[in-house]
Design a protein with these regions (language model features):
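Active-site-adjacent substrate/metal-binding segments within catalytic domains
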Residues: 85-139, 143-151, 157-162, 228, ...
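Conserved, mostly hydrophobic/aromatic
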Residues: 165, 221, 319, 356, ...
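Extracellular recognition modules
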Residues: 194-196, 320-324
């Protein structure tokens, strides 16, 4: 498959070869790796990348991804970071209008009788800036022999990806991770990852938030190695009964497997380091069809034989959950940790109750923001915000107007902050979408 610049204009195409969305869990080869937060299977690609700015698609270096292309005259840019805050393009703030209103007439494809199919709307625009990024890397020894993926945690707004001259995929949706399989084209040394980012696409009709408009790779980029058996997706549902001391635990998991083998998957719950419950999951195998990767699914629901400590903002009590994957010899292949809390949220006669008691929310709206770096923030800024929350007796937050970085949600669990998480979906008043 080859990349097509016309995908920018087509509202029906918003992902090509992108992996399905899945849970945001970490995973490790052993408990020792987990305790040390080992990077055995994760490598950050953040840092200085080669970069070329172009005003539109027609003037971009269209062949920059090809092997042997001379990019010696490219600039250097920091990833993650907004392109506009590193000396290129212009900063723009818009609230209730599309960013091109008053400059260009655009209506979404098929939205009104004379809208047409949108051909050339963005791909042939005189102003639709493009950022061409190049990163070179060698494969870590711990990655070799495993499946290798790249994860972009946030890219505004549409991106094309190549590795070693081969087209990998395309994605829109600026504030959710996009993950791609690099395995067929990865090398031990001298890999060339190329990313072409376009400021606007048909996604712009849906991503019309009231904030500063930027573009570029503004969140971290990670290489991930997946072992022969890997937990792809996990859903954990802690259920607190009316007694507030008893409850159930529901677990659903989906695993991928390079080749068929017997495995044992065990759910384990710990309280302050001590195992208080564990149970094996019954797994079902299914062939994916066109792929060589087998899919394995499992589910369980059990009443916990413990006296539960509920979670609330006064006492955000968390239990340590782990999903263990072992082979037929009982050797650990992978573990997936998750911190979970038990709470019961209800609305009775238009009143919110938590664990049977009325809940009073003292909340705020929060943008991811740092004065010099825009929405490109780190965990340091997140912790400062949480400190301000606690100093001002704030117990709830609305992530206006987009999904925040993944660590933020874990921090809110730990700090006892009720979180309303937005999807990145906002249309202006009287929109024709």
């Amino acid at each position: 498959m080859k990349a097509d610049i016309r995908w920018l204009d087509n509202p029906e195409i918003f992902r090509v070869n992108r992996e399905d969305a899945h849970s945001d869990h970490a995973y490790y080869a052993s408990y020792n790796d987990m305790e040390k937060k080992s990077d055995r299977w994760v490598m950050l690609l953040d840092g200085l990348w080669k970069f070329r700015y172009s005003k539109n698609a027609a003037s971009r270096p269209a062949d920059f991804y090809k092997e042997g292309y001379d990019d010696s005259n490219f600039d250097m840019i920091r990833v993650p970071g907004h392109i506009e805050l590193q000396g290129y393009d212009k900063i723009q703030y818009i609230n209730t209008m599309y960013p091109w209103e008053g400059h260009e007439y655009r209506r979404p494809a098929y939205s009104i009788e004379n809208a047409g199919n949108g051909a050339g709307m963005f791909s042939e625009a005189s102003y639709n800036p493009v950022g061409s990024y190049v990163c070179t890397f060698d494969l870590p020894e711990t990655f070799q022999g495993n499946r290798v993926y790249v994860c972009f945690e946030g890219v505004e707004q549409a991106m094309y990806i190549w590795l070693n001259g081969e087209f990998i995929g395309y994605a829109e949706d600026s504030f959710t991770p996009s993950e791609f399989d690099l395995t067929p084209y990865i090398r031990t040394e001298g890999n060339k990852l190329c990313v072409e980012v376009h400021k606007r696409s048909t996604a712009a009709f849906l991503e019309d938030q009231d904030f500063f408009r930027f573009f570029g790779i503004f969140r971290s980029v990670k290489l991930k190695a997946k072992p022969c058996v890997h937990v792809e997706d996990i859903f954990i549902r802690p259920i607190l009964w009316n007694s507030n001391i008893q409850g159930n635990l529901e677990v659903n998991a989906k695993l991928s497997m390079v080749y068929a083998k017997d495995i044992r998957v065990t759910a384990v719950l710990r309280d302050k380091g001590k195992i208080c419950w564990s149970q094996d999951m019954k797994m079902q195998y299914s062939d994916k069809g066109t792929s060589n990767i087998l899919q394995v699914t499992g589910a369980l629901k059990d009443t916990l034989p413990i006296s539960i400590t509920p979670w609330d903002h006064h006492k955000p009590y968390l239990y340590d959950f782990c999903l263990e994957v072992r082979d037929q010899d009982n050797c650990l292949i992978e573990i997936v940790p998750y911190a979970i809390g038990f709470r019961r949220l209800e609305i009775i006669d238009k009143v919110i109750y938590l664990n049977g008691k009325r809940l009073i929310l003292t909340g705020i709206n929060r943008h991811e923001w740092e004065p010099h770096k825009g929405r490109c923030i780190t965990e340091k800024e997140m912790r400062i915000d949480l400190m301000l929350f606690q100093q001002n007796h704030i117990n709830a937050v609305r992530t206006c107007h987009y999904p925040n970085q993944i660590p933020w949600y874990y921090m809110c669990d730990e700090a006892g902050i009720y979180t309303v998480s937005y999807t990145h979906l906002t249309l202006p008043t009287n929109s024709l979408v």
